[in-house]
């Protein structure tokens, strides 16, 4: 290349550089188009599969024996918050579904919009409650909490979730947008090419690391009300806390994911039998890590912690952590450094009238 620069006139050198740059832009554009085509094909295949199942259901006609028993009628919704180890956990559900005989379905919303339109809410509720062929079912996706009760359904799904320290989650998401992770390393990310560190972003007051970007876990638990997405809303945080306690079966934390999985296996073995052992000894696909991630400095963390938004998101995180640890304390015991699930700790007596 150095010899060519010596032999080529300056104008030709400039033309060569321009031609190379144009060629690279063209290649990147083609790669992007291929990715978009692949995504469209995946969605088309998924829609076709759904139509086939619905057609079979229609042709079979209404079944008189279609009533499912309690366990077979179960539906779990994991409305996963981005960058909380959600892929690691979901991969376990996929690995167990054939063995434990349930279905796993990804809720793919346009542009990952966590808020559904009213008509899509109706469709979603109808699908989940009446789609017997997909029961028992485990649904997962980046969708905010949806209250099934207001749609008049008799049996609501079981909600679960995992949340993470809000600053750690934001840092992970910041680098994920730029460098991706080891799960799909070849995929081009939206902010790819931006080498600015998280510390530099905060120091410069960048939009990708602004305190407003912390506001995500609260609205995901709050739901589809407009106030949920009003950044810094005290009402939204209170509603998120209410839903966590009253509408979620179990909410774990990323930092204690194994304990979360252990509790699910003990309480819902129909879905999670074998999950703890799989997490401990299974394939590396369960361990998804953002690449090129640099931990923020104490100064950066301190600056973010001055924000009222961080204070609210952190209060919600601490609330969830305390609740999770309370549930765990009443479900397990520690022995020689290992946790053990408690056996049944209640029984019935004084049963009347006496049978003959």
UniProtKB/Swiss-Prot annotation:
Disulfide bonds join 201-209, 222-228. It is an enzyme of class 2 (transferase). N-glycosylated. The active site is at residues 140, 142. Keywords: Coiled coil, Disease variant, Disulfide bond, Glycoprotein, Golgi apparatus, Intellectual disability, Membrane, Signal-anchor, Transferase, Transmembrane, Transmembrane helix. The chain crosses the membrane at residues 12-28. One of its GO terms (molecular function) is heparan sulfate 2-sulfotransferase activity. InterPro entries: Heparan_SO4_2-O-STrfase, P-loop_NTPase, Sulfotransferase. Its EC number is 2.8.2.-. Belongs to the sulfotransferase 3 family. This is Heparan sulfate 2-O-sulfotransferase 1. It comes from Homo sapiens. The gene is HS2ST1.
């Amino acid at each position: 290349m150095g010899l060519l620069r010596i032999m080529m006139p300056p104008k030709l050198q400039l033309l060569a550089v321009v031609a190379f740059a144009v060629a690279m832009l063209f290649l990147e554009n083609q790669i992007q188009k291929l990715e978009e085509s692949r995504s469209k094909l995946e969605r088309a295949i998924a829609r076709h599969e759904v139509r086939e199942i619905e057609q079979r259901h229609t042709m079979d006609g209404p079944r008189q024996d279609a009533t499912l028993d309690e366990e077979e009628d179960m539906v779990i919704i994991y409305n996963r918050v981005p960058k909380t180890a959600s892929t690691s956990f979901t991969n376990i559900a996929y690995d167990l579904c054939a063995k434990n005989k349930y279905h796993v379905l990804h809720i793919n919303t346009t542009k990952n919009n966590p808020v559904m339109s009213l008509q899509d809410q109706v469709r979603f509720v109808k699908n989940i409650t009446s789609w017997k062929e997909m029961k028992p079912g485990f649904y997962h996706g980046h969708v905010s909490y949806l209250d099934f009760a207001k749609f008049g359904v008799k049996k609501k799904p079981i909600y679960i979730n995992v949340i993470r320290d809000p600053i750690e989650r934001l840092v992970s998401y910041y680098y994920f947008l730029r460098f991706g992770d080891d799960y799909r390393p070849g995929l081009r990310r939206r902010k790819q090419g931006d080498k600015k560190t998280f510390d530099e972003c905060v120091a410069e007051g960048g939009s990708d690391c602004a305190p407003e970007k912390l506001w995500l876990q609260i609205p995901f638990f709050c739901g589809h009300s407009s106030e949920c997405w009003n950044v810094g809303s005290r009402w939204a945080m209170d509603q998120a806390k209410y839903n966590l306690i009253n509408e979620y079966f179990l909410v774990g934390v990323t930092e204690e994911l194994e304990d979360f999985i252990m509790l699910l296996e003990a309480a819902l073995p129909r879905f999670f039998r074998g999950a703890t052992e799989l997490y401990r000894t299974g394939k590396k696909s369960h361990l998804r890590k953002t690449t090129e991630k640099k931990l923020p400095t104490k100064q950066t963390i301190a600056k973010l912690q001055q924000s009222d938004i961080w204070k609210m998101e952190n209060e919600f995180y601490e609330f969830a952590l305390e609740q999770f640890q309370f549930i765990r304390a009443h479900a397990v015991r520690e022995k020689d450094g290992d946790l053990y699930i408690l056996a049944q700790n209640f029984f019935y007596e004084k049963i009347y009238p006496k049978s003959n």
